[in-house]
Amino acid sequence: MSAIKTITKASHLIDMNDIIREGHPTLRAVAQDVTFPLNEDDIILGEKMLQFLKNSQDPVTAEKMELRGGVGLAAPQLDISKRIIAVLIPNPEDKDGNPPKEAYALKEVMYNPRIIAHSVQDAALADGEGCLSVDRVVEGYVIRHSRVTIEYYDKNSDKKKLKLKGYQSIVVQHEIDHTNGIMFFDRINEKNPFEIKEGLLLIE
C-alpha cells in the first residue's frame, strides 16, 4: 500500500515509523505541485500532518506514542513527494507562567508554498536546527533569510500570502526546503559551522 493510502486511512495516526530518515531518496527529490481543487487524500493528509504536530507537542500523547516534538512537517518526510507542509508554532507563556491568549503563533497547512520575496539579511537559530528525519545532532548555524514572504494555497484552494520574520520564518523555510530536496545541514558552512558573517541575525 502506498504511503498516502496508509496515512490517510481514517484509523491511522502519524507516528515516527511513518517518517523516513536521511539517506532516503524521497528526501532528496524535488516534490510535485499539488493540483486544484484538492483531492480528498491531500486534504486529509494535511489534517493528519497538523494532528501529528499537535500530538508531538502534548507531553502525555508524545510519551504514549513515542513522538519527537516538532513544529513543522513536510509531506516528503512521509515518503509522499508532494508540496504540502504543516506548521504549528506555539506561543510562549508570559513571564508569570500564564498561558498565552492565542495558543499558536502560526497554525497552517500550506499547499504549493513558495518564497516570493525575502530580506537581504540572513538569520540562523543560535541553538542550530534539528529535523524529525535526522536522528543525529548536526551542529552549526543554518543560514536562512531573516524575513520572507510566502505564497501558498490553503485547503479550500484559496491563494494566501504571508509575511514572516524570526523563528516563524526559519521554520517555514526549513519545511519548504524539504519540498525541494534540501536538508537543513546543507545550509551549514562545512569548513566553519559557527561562522558569523557580517549582518547575520542570531535568533535565540
UniProtKB/Swiss-Prot annotation:
Keywords: Hydrolase, Iron, Metal-binding, Protein biosynthesis. It catalyses: N-terminal N-formyl-L-methionyl-[peptide] + H2O = N-terminal L-methionyl-[peptide] + formate. GO terms for molecular function: metal ion binding; peptide deformylase activity. Pfam families: Pep_deformylase. The keyword Protein biosynthesis applies. Its EC number is 3.5.1.88. Removes the formyl group from the N-terminal Met of newly synthesized proteins. Requires at least a dipeptide for an efficient rate of reaction. N-terminal L-methionine is a prerequisite for activity but the enzyme has broad specificity at other positions. It comes from Streptococcus mutans serotype c (strain ATCC 700610 / UA159). Belongs to the polypeptide deformylase family. The keyword Translocase does not apply. This is Peptide deformylase. The active site is at 175. CDD domains: Pep_deformylase. Fe cation binds at residues 131, 174, 178. Binds 1 Fe(2+) ion. GO terms for biological process: co-translational protein modification; translation. Its cofactor is Fe(2+).
